[in-house]
Amino acid sequence: MLFRTAGTPINFLKHASPDGRRIIFLQDKERSKRHMKKRIIVCVLTLLMLSLMTACGGGTNPDGNTDGFPVPEGEPSYGGEITVGITADLDSSLDPHVSSSSAGTREVLFNVFEGLMKTDPEGNMVPAVAESYTVNDAADEYTFVLRKGIKFHNGNDVTVDDVVYSLSRAAGLETGEPLVADVANIKSVKATGDDTIVIKLAAPDTEFLAHITTAIIPKDIDPSKEVVGTGPFKFAGRKVQDNIVLEKFGEYWGEPAYLDKVTLKVIDNSETLVMSLKSGAIDMATHLIASQVKELQGLNIVEGPSNAVQALYINNSFKPFSDVRVRQALCYAVNKQDILDLAFDGYGSLVGSSMFPALKNYFMDDLTNYYEPDPAKAKELLTEAGYPDGIEFTITVPSTMQQHVDTAQVIVEQLQAAGITAKINQVDWTTWLEDVYKGRKFEATVVSLDSHGVAASDLLARFQSDNAKNFINFSSEEYDAAYKKAISTVDPEAQTEAFKECETILTEQAANVYIQDTSSFVAMGADYYGYVYYPLYVADFAKVYKFAE
């Protein structure tokens, strides 16, 4: 039985904002009826609207252009606080160099820590702790000049020694064991003056600027016990499995945060999360799905991409999935457009490989429909592989992530037409991390894999045969060669083509059943504004504000 009956469309109107978001204000029933009659037209026009929004560019600016959606009169005010519901607690350690397994943890720590560079809302790499940089022609030596006057949250000035310590630690230069895979290519980090450091790489890397977002921390603290960064918010406290508190950092070098305090409340039940929004127990929640925001009358809803690849991720070493024909059969048995329509009310962007549309230089739209739904073809492939009576397997899904539970339920129904029997095992997030992601003790799972940066390698590196994050156990000499070619060239065009070759191999070899970049909805109380989507999985609380009364 399907998880629910496909209901009526979400009752809201969409307005284009300058930064490419869609601001949604829930409307009354009479307006909703008129909107429903126009749904088909809206779906077509949305495609045009998206292209226009992309052209607009720019981040959210409370004082700037607000054409296209209503904004209350008055000025954004500094001060106040917000309570944000999150569906899972952060990692047990908030050491920024080791707490990278959870996307949710990285999402929050984005507000606390900064690297030499950071990503802006348009996906550009811009200086943060660094003020400027130069790169040699071989792309194997990067020189950074530090920004003057930056302070850590403990009040100390940021020095070149702190930067050298942070990057050396993250790259494992003393231990030989990198803590952060993105900077494992660093061969040496040296200070050449009071404000200048030179980083030499073991191999050329034209994407290195996208990797040097690794947190800069003080050299004289224990990062396993103290959470000290340079971001717009400082860590103020935590109650495990209950809440995390961030406070505004008054000496932040950049644009100050509007809010004085952000409390992240752990609510591990999706229904309770929605009820908490409706009752006002919390003011904001991110990563909601269409069926949830239907219920949130009177709240401001912002829609944007998740910038993560949702798929039925397959353990390629598990028999029968070690046979490419079986994996391809799964691809033919799944109708991802139906998944969008049934589980997401049509919201989302279909994908065909491990790349999402926001990384437009690398995204390959022609792979989206590489496997047209064909249950008969799926049965044929299973028979060729020696399974004429079909196969059975278990899909392990994080129980707190309703969008993935819903997707898995639709998939289970679809697979039956191809003679495939699947059952769902819902587990808590901690169990999923330990058993699936780290332990690789699973057959298949439905999740979304995000990119912690804007480099293609952030999404594709994990599928190398020997990569520690290759939890699906995908192994392909062809893929490894293509990836090596991509990261070793200094020719941007050749690199892009090599990364696209990697994407094509993942699709052709059916490493996973790729589905979509899900639409993500952020709900905020009616007096909160300013949320900005980035082309990666982060939540920027510094831009959220209230209007002065």
Residue ranges and their predicted role:
Residues A333-N361, Q403-V412, L433, Y437-E549:
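Detector for C-terminal structural segments
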Residues G85-V135, S168, V228:
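N-terminal lobe/hinge region of extracytoplasmic solute-binding protein
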Residues T134, A138, P178-D220:
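Surface-exposed binding/hinge segments that line
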Residues F249-K294, T421:
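Ligand-site clamp/hinge motif
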Residues T87-R106, V129-A130, N156, F208-A215, ...:
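A structural "hinge/loop" feature
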Residues S349-E384, M401-H404:
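Structural transition elements
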Residues T83, T159-S166, D194-V198, G231-P232, ...:
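Alpha-helical secondary-structure segments
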Residues P121-N124, D205-T263, N269-T272, A376, ...:
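Gly/Pro-rich hinge or "lid" segments in bacterial periplasmic/extracellular proteins
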